UniProtKB/Swiss-Prot annotation:
CDD domains per UniProt: ASS (cd01999)
Residues annotated to bind L-aspartate: 119, 123-124
Protein name (database record): Argininosuccinate synthase
Any Gene Ontology CC annotation: cytoplasm
Known pathway: Amino-acid biosynthesis; L-arginine biosynthesis; L-arginine from L-ornithine and carbamoyl phosphate: step 2/3
Binding site for L-citrulline: 87, 123, 127, 175, 184, 260, 272
InterPro entries according to UniProt: Arginosuc_syn_C (IPR048268), Arginosuc_syn_N (IPR048267), Arginosuc_synth (IPR001518), Arginosuc_synth_CS (IPR018223), Arginosuc_synth_type_1_subfam (IPR023434), AS_cat/multimer_dom_body (IPR024074), Rossmann-like_a/b/a_fold (IPR014729)
Keyword Transmembrane: no
Residues binding ATP, per UniProt: 9-17, 117
Keywords linked to the UniProt accession: Amino-acid biosynthesis, Arginine biosynthesis, ATP-binding, Cytoplasm, Ligase, Nucleotide-binding
Amino acid sequence: MAKDKIVLAYSGGLDTSVAIKWLQDTYNYDVIAVALDVGEGKDLDFVQKKALQVGALKSIVVDAKDAFAEEFVLPALKANAMYEGKYPLVSALSRYLISRVLVEIAEKEGAVAVAHGCTGKGNDQVRFDVSFTALNPDIKIVAPVREWGWTRDEEIEYAKKNNIPIPIDLDNPYSIDQNLWGRSCECGVLEDPWAAPPEGAYDLTKSIMDAPDEAEEIEITFVQGKPTALNGEELPLAELILKLNKIAGNHGVGRIDHVENRLVGIKSREVYETPAATTLILAHRELEFLTQPREVAQFKPIVEQKLAQVIYEGLWFSPIRNAVQAFIEETQKHVTGVVRVKLHKGHAIVVGRTSASSLYSHELATYNAGDQFDHKAALGFIKLWGLPTKVYAQVNEGVLHENKNTAIKILDEKDAIKQ
């Protein structure tokens, strides 16, 4: 009788390598290991072979860089999505693509279940489980690391007992996740929020001390909110992001040290490196300021915050994400132009922007000759704008005077105390 099959999100690390054998021993599954290339720079040929070596029935590698950039990173960029105003959702965004690919392969292979290597303490378990359920409500979900509850030493002992290769970097004190949108680093000394992150925690960015002394200016072209060219060179989005990671990272741009509120109810200290994300979000936002009407520019940040929360909290495959993203897309119709950014010693600074859809009028803004603003119209506008305030003051004159007298009395008492 054929065994049931399960599709495992496989990274090549210790946890998911042990999971292959554990799933076989515990559930008698045939394991199909799936690794996605989302721009993390891993040797996926090695990862693919390792899964088979450990005992997977089949090992599949998917080049998902373009899909990740176009379908997940781009909507987040158009929304300037930053969880709690700091984190560009590096890991969160990739989980939804991984979930979708796993379910697609599971359905194609006739698998009855999917599995991931998340612990019971993090956000990713929520993102995976909720996404799997949204994409296929009937599929079974197994989380080996969450289930087995082993210590690190017990896991290593299991690996040795079953001839599972132990990664050579196992003594690395950090837990790292990386894709083309950035890199996250936690654990080790970083668990102390008072301790400064050591340089060893960083990889994509130079320290300010080591960054070039001379600033570098770059130009980013956007078409309806999408970056399409870097310094005049048109590039696929994934390639543009990876190239910008190197350029901005060389100048130390994109280091984020953040104590964030996890979905599971705890606070965690994370160190992120997001050179391209930091630069692109900055440039995109500035182009929006140039091309969007005031009401849109002032309201959109509220929607941006909601989308960031939805992405962080595992709700990509939900009606709220669809609705919020539809609004964001509507705001991008005229966000087309070029932004010039100066990179220097950890800073990305917008120093120029231009657009055929610019709502900035030099003739209306200038204080020099050629000023076309109707200064005389200001008086009538001010009278109408301030009319509700004037009426309120007239109706509530006694209350206003009472508050005024109270304030004066308090000041007098303070002066008396000083004397």
